[in-house]
UniProtKB/Swiss-Prot annotation:
InterPro entries: Aldolase_TIM, His_biosynth, HisA_bact_arch, Isoase_HisA-like, Isoase_HisA-like_bact, RibuloseP-bd_barrel. SUPFAM superfamilies: Ribulose-phoshate binding barrel. The keyword Cytoplasm applies. Its main location: cytoplasm. This is 1-(5-phosphoribosyl)-5-[(5-phosphoribosylamino)methylideneamino] imidazole-4-carboxamide isomerase. It catalyses: 1-(5-phospho-beta-D-ribosyl)-5-[(5-phospho-beta-D-ribosylamino)methylideneamino]imidazole-4-carboxamide = 5-[(5-phospho-1-deoxy-D-ribulos-1-ylimino)methylamino]-1-(5-phospho-beta-D-ribosyl)imidazole-4-carboxamide. It is an enzyme of class 5 (isomerase). It is found in: Cytoplasm. Belongs to the HisA/HisF family. The gene is hisA. The active site is at residues 8, 131. Its EC number is 5.3.1.16. HAMAP family: HisA. Keywords: Amino-acid biosynthesis, Cytoplasm, Histidine biosynthesis, Isomerase.
Length: 257
């Protein structure tokens, strides 16, 4: 299982929010590209990038910082990017810039036809980010909670051909409160594609618990505030995940390797 460092971008800086609220922001670095190199040097095998301004604006807002990150790490490890991606032209531009996987969130929920077209146009490169509060999907940078059930939508999008589902529990994101294991496991069991857990991954206990569920289809865990504030040592976490992964027989999670 992969432990995936998150680099959330706001106004060109590497930040973390609490529960997705733009005002609850902590700036961790004014040089996101250097931060990307740091995680690469620590042994990261994938980076999770989010254009926070873009998620709220509905269009890319941190493209320069994203290009700098891609330039800094080259093709050494894959990247996955979400936030404000609402049309095929933006997807094509990011892929041309060197991003490996595109994460579609709000647009997948509001205009599923767009997601279907994206999967057809860029097979193997499209993921869906489902961000939930109390089991219901949220959109527009988490500012609006819909009536859509997470599992129902994920199964629909799986049929479209998405590569993986990134599941975030909004109530736990940036709170260092632990992963919503029950909801993450329920989602993974309902799908045949990999699930990447996010929101609240903050300790080695979280990593261990998720690794135990890897055979159910949980292929990765995104972590942010914990590795920036030091409550979770990234390198130790990935080493633990590697050790535990050799002891399990996971469902097809080869997308992440």
């Amino acid at each position: 299982m992969l432990i995936i460092p998150a680099i959330d971008l706001k106004d060109g800086h590497c930040v973390r929010l609490k529960q997705g609220v733009m005002e609850n922001v902590t700036v961790f670095s004014e040089d996101p590209a250097a931060m990307a190199r740091h995680w690469l040097d620590q042994g990261a095998r994938r980076l999770h990038l989010v254009d926070l301004n873009g998620a709220f604006a509905g269009k890319p807002k941190n493209e320069l910082a994203i290009r700098d990150i891609v330039d800094a790490i080259g093709d050494e490890i894959p990247t996955q990017l979400g936030g404000g991606i609402r049309d095929l032209e933006t997807i094509e531009r990011y892929l041309d810039d060197g991003i490996t996987y595109i994460i579609i969130g709000t647009a997948a929920v509001k205009t599923p036809g767009f997601l279907h077209d994206a999967c057809n146009a860029f097979p193997g490169h499209i993921m869906v980010g489902l961000d939930a509060k109390d089991g219901k999907v949220a959109v527009n940078g988490w500012s609006k909670v819909t009536g859509h059930d997470v599992v129902d939508l994920a199964k629909k999008f799986e049929d479209y051909g998405v590569e993986a589902i990134i599941y975030t529990d909004i109530g736990r994101d940036g709170m260092l409160s632990g992963v919503n294991l029950k909801a993450t496991l329920e989602l993974a069991r309902a799908l045949t594609i990999p699930v990447i857990a996010s929101g609240g991954v903050s300790s080695l206990d979280d990593v261990k618990a998720l690794c135990e569920m890897e055979p159910e289809g949980i292929a990765g865990a995104i972590t942010g505030r914990a590795i920036y504030e030091g409550t979770l040592d990234f390198k130790v976490a990935q080493e633990l995940a590697d050790e535990l992964s050799t002891q399990s027989s996971p469902r097809d999670t080869t997308i992440l390797f």
